[in-house]
């Protein structure tokens, strides 16, 4: 056989073997617990580590899931690896619904980003939702104790911002918008575009690239050390989620559909393995929050958490090479009167040796 051809075949075998044959580790789930409930609707979680402390954020609203000016973002901190949590900040934006908060550690500063629907002085009727009035905001802290006032994110008007990531001295956001900011109904669904937004300081943003020109929705980014990008995107049409890959300079994108929908997607690396999380729909049990190993282009489920109804949007933080925490929200429990509550939950993951 030609030596050059043999080298190509060997290289292809190694790539395929590493992508598809490596078995992910076994995981045990323990210490499942409710960590926050204040009588309000609590949802959309994220976790991070900053200056030796753990941080948990989520939206809280006395009026429920939909678009209300009464919503706010809560930030909790733990100094004991998640055993106990203390509120360190809570913020809102006048006449806007703050939701989907996400962390980013960037330039030695902790940011919390939120996409905000314009609501006005009262609850906004669903028929009046307008993606073109969306605007991103952030609060930030240099020490996790003292926080800025909410800062409007330049370049995000008309964009529904979502998860953030950083690589190579730049910050990146998923932003979705209507093509040409067209005037019309709400703007969610098959026509919506997903963009990679880029920033030098975490506050002023510009378009870097489109990665979904149709069916754009919530998308999570994961950068490899060499700049390669892996992303998991919710399908704006409610169908199977997207597995998206690119590499610098992010001008070409490989997009393929997974075998299931994923609501509120998460993608993180734990050691040498990639975890995907979010909401799934089951037959007979409704929606559930689950975690998967990504093996090649396939998902292998390893955990389904106690959850139901309005739920998902997990966060993840590694505690050690064999231990991690997962946060999520759910409405599967009830209060003393038998009414459903929507609360924040946490679980510990341990890799089996």
Name what the model sees in each region:
Residues 2, 8-20:
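Short, basic, low-complexity termini and linkers enriched in Ser/Thr/Gly/Pro
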Residues 22-40, 49-96, 104-309, 319-353:
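Beta-rich carbohydrate-recognition and catalytic domains
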Residues 316:
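Hydrophobic, well-ordered secondary-structure elements that form the walls
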